[in-house]
Every structure is written in C-alpha cells, then in structure tokens.
Amino acid sequence: MNEEIMTQLRSHREVMEAVERELTPRIAAFAGMLVAALKGGKKLLVMGNGGSAADAQHFAAEIVGRFKMERRGLPAVALTTDTSILTAIGNDYGFDAVFRRQVEALADEGDVVVGLSTSGSSRNVYDALALANDRGCITVGLLGRDGGTLKDIVDLDVTVPSGDTPRIQEGHITIIHIVCDLVEKGLFK
C-alpha cells in the first residue's frame, strides 16, 4: 500500500512540474484576462461535468466569497449548481443544452466564460463556449489530455499535460487557486 501511495504522489508531482514548466505563461494570461474583465465590470461564468462541475462551483465560490484576502465579492456564476435550471433545460432541450442555454441567458460581451473538461471534448461545454464566442465573451478552456475539440474554439486553452483524469483535476484546482490568488492581488493590492 505504501508503494502505491508513493507512486500516486510521484505522479502528482510530475504533473505539477509539467504544469509549472509548460503552463505558467498561459496561467498568467488567464489571470490577466479575468482581472481585466472584472475591472471592467464583467463577470465570470464557469462550467464542467462531474468532478469538473465541482471545480467550477469551487472556482465561483472563491471569486464571489474570497480566496485569501478580505475584499468585496466579485461576480461569478457556476452554471452547474441550480438543479431546477439544469433539470428543466435537460428535460426540455436535452443535456447538451444545459450550459448553452444559461450562456444565452447570462453571458454579456466581455464576460469570461470558462469550460472545464478533463477530456477536452464535452459536448455541452463545447456548445456553450461556441455560443459564448458568438456573443463576444472571452473563452478559456481548462482542459486535459490533448485539449480535445475545445482547445480549438477557446481564446485560451490551459491544457494540463496528462492523460490521467485525477491528475488533470488536481492540475485544474491548482490552476484555479493560482488564478484566484492573482485576481485578488491584481484587483485589491
């Protein structure tokens, strides 16, 4: 059992080292885009499925509530949290529309719309990001593997260089925490 634990921790460390080596400029760009948008009175919309839905909710909570700094709340919405909206849209239009319909209702030009997908190929995230692009939003993909179909439609892809879903999710939450820290410092220091 100890060997398996050490193997998992080594794997985590290797992915985090690759994130540092390969994604630092993209993470900085992501944070810069979000700071500029929030300074301009825009908001963050964020979505994903399964574990990525939980990460989307976590991201929005850190932006609306606080990350480390006592400060005013900032506008962010996780499109994954309202069960009435999700089930109504899913029932009436199908699961592929659950995020797209919310982007249609909530996204304004200049908002930052983030899709999380460990595969990079979630259809409902793709459709929502495509609409966000049409509406003049800034689109970011927190992705995994090779970035899938999403990397080609977002303004900025931040693709964790791993094919292992747990490691990708760990990369995503680390990136989210770094971005939250940079947003607070960029807006309030």
UniProtKB/Swiss-Prot annotation:
Its EC number is 5.3.1.28. Substrate binds at N49, G50, G51, E62, N91, D92, S117, T118, S119, S122, Q169. Pfam families: SIS_2. Homotetramer. Belongs to the SIS family. GmhA subfamily. Catalyzes the isomerization of sedoheptulose 7-phosphate in D-glycero-D-manno-heptose 7-phosphate. It is found in: Cytoplasm. It comes from Geobacter metallireducens (strain ATCC 53774 / DSM 7210 / GS-15). Zn(2+) binds at H58, E62, Q169, H177. GO terms for biological process: carbohydrate metabolic process; D-glycero-D-manno-heptose 7-phosphate biosynthetic process. GO terms for cellular component: cytoplasm. It catalyses: 2 D-sedoheptulose 7-phosphate = D-glycero-alpha-D-manno-heptose 7-phosphate + D-glycero-beta-D-manno-heptose 7-phosphate. One of its GO terms (molecular function) is D-sedoheptulose 7-phosphate isomerase activity. Its cofactor is Zn(2+). This is Phosphoheptose isomerase. Binds 1 zinc ion per subunit. The lineage of its organism: Bacteria, Pseudomonadati, Thermodesulfobacteriota, Desulfuromonadia, Geobacterales. CDD domains: SIS_GmhA. It is an enzyme of class 5 (isomerase). Pathway: Carbohydrate biosynthesis; D-glycero-D-manno-heptose 7-phosphate biosynthesis; D-glycero-alpha-D-manno-heptose 7-phosphate and D-glycero-beta-D-manno-heptose 7-phosphate from sedoheptulose 7-phosphate: step 1/1.
